Amino acid sequence: MENMAEDLRQKAMALEIYNQQLQMIQSEITSIRALKSEIMNSIKTIENIKADEETLIPVGPGVFLKAKIVDDKALIGVKSDIYVEKSFNEVIEDLKKSVEDLDKAEKEGMKKAEELAKAITALRKELQTEIQKAQQAQDKKQ
């Protein structure tokens, strides 16, 4: 009986750990989706900007500066305080590559989440069965 109780505790702890891992993965997927959305918005913005055109540059919540685009180049951060100048087309290609990488990461995360959800369901069923057996054994003793 004591082995059964210990087994139940271990499985309950494993179930809790699996649930925490699933929440972490779901949080990562949410972050990936938000980043993808931000990158897609950047791509649309860059595609619509033309040289010699006036635009608004966001500098804070609800604060914009009027600016004139002088050419079709952008500065891209590659490391801390290191920037590389690239054409809008190159930037768009780099951003599209980032979206592809994020798509792969999202799919991997979804696959892991699905596997973990199946493991959680199986462990939960197993735990419920063992709890019922323990209750039946307890009832027989009484």
From Swiss-Prot:
NCBIfam families attached to this UniProt entry: prefoldin subunit alpha (TIGR00293)
Asked if the Swiss-Prot or TrEMBL record annotates the protein with the keyword Cell wall biogenesis/degradation, the reply is no
User: What is the protein named?
Assistant: Prefoldin subunit alpha 1
Q: Phosphoprotein as a keyword? A: no
- Which keywords, in A-to-Z order, does the entry hold? Chaperone, Cytoplasm
GO BP term, example: protein folding
Known InterPro entries for this protein? Answer: PFD_alpha_archaea, Prefoldin, Prefoldin_subunit_alpha
Where in the cell is the protein located? Cytoplasm
Q: How does it assemble?
A: Heterohexamer of two alpha and four beta subunits.
Function summary: Molecular chaperone capable of stabilizing a range of proteins. Seems to fulfill an ATP-independent, HSP70-like function in archaeal de novo protein folding.
UniProt GO MF annotations: unfolded protein binding
| Species of provenance | Methanocaldococcus jannaschii (strain ATCC 43067 / DSM 2661 / JAL-1 / JCM 10045 / NBRC 100440) (Methanococcus jannaschii)
Write down a Pfam family by its short name: Prefoldin
The cellular component terms of Gene Ontology attached to this UniProt record, alphabetical and capped at eight, are: cytoplasm; prefoldin complex
Main localisation: cytoplasm
Q: Per the similarity annotation, which family is this?
A: Belongs to the prefoldin subunit alpha family.
Residues forming coiled coils:
none
